[in-house]
From Swiss-Prot:
GO BP terms: L-histidine biosynthetic process; L-tryptophan biosynthetic process
Protein name as catalogued: 1-(5-phosphoribosyl)-5-[(5-phosphoribosylamino)methylideneamino] imidazole-4-carboxamide isomerase
Provenance organism: Desulforudis audaxviator (strain MP104C)
Subcellular location: Cytoplasm
One Pfam family matching this protein: His_biosynth
Gene from which this protein is expressed: hisA
Amino acid sequence: MLIIPAVDLRGGRCVRLFQGRADQETVYSTDPVAVARTWEEQGARRLHVVDLDGAFTGKPQNSGVVLDIVKSVNIPVQVGGGIRNPENVKCYLEHGVDRVILGTAALTNPEFLDAVVAAYGERIVVGVDCRDGRVCVQGWEQTAATDVLPFLEELVRRGVRRVVFTDVKRDGTLEGPNLEEIARVAAHTELKVIASGGVSRLEDLRALKKLEHLGVDSVIIGKALYAGTITLAEALALERKEKDNVGQEDHSLPRCEPGPRG
């Protein structure tokens, strides 16, 4: 399972919000580029960058900082927040962003989603942000009437292959991920799922690892890293240990003996 550190941007700073609320902000750094470099230096293999101002206003507000991050690291960067037209998508992807994450626009503008999926394929990811089983839009400030499972089915029909699933009530709380809902979402379709929201300890990562067979192949960690309840080194060590264990199990499988020749 891939561990992905989060870098959330607001007013050019690196921040974390509690349950996505704009009025409950903690500033962790005034230099998001340095933060991104630190995560890379500590071994991260991908970064998750969110333009919170963009999510709230409906258009990118921190794109300069985003592109500075992309230029400053040598690992893939996925970006979301306020990306609601083809020009936004094209600009980011042509300037080195690896994946673009669509939120509100994926629900409200399906023709736009169709167009960018047709043009860019798996570089388009949809952020499925939920509260009580319903999809949230407009920077999580509104909860749509759309139930999450039919929405996932619609995404599959439109060619989407990967989603970032966030339980809004858990995000930034350090209360642990909503494992039951993540499992329900992952089991419902063949979509690859990046889990996000609530991770606070290594036990949470171990529990998410058990959902890998359902398609949960990555996890975004935000506040836990900034608050120090998990270090990136610990998370990556767990990731490596799981890989090593899988390798050992593979080598210990009994050999198949050749059958009789006909």
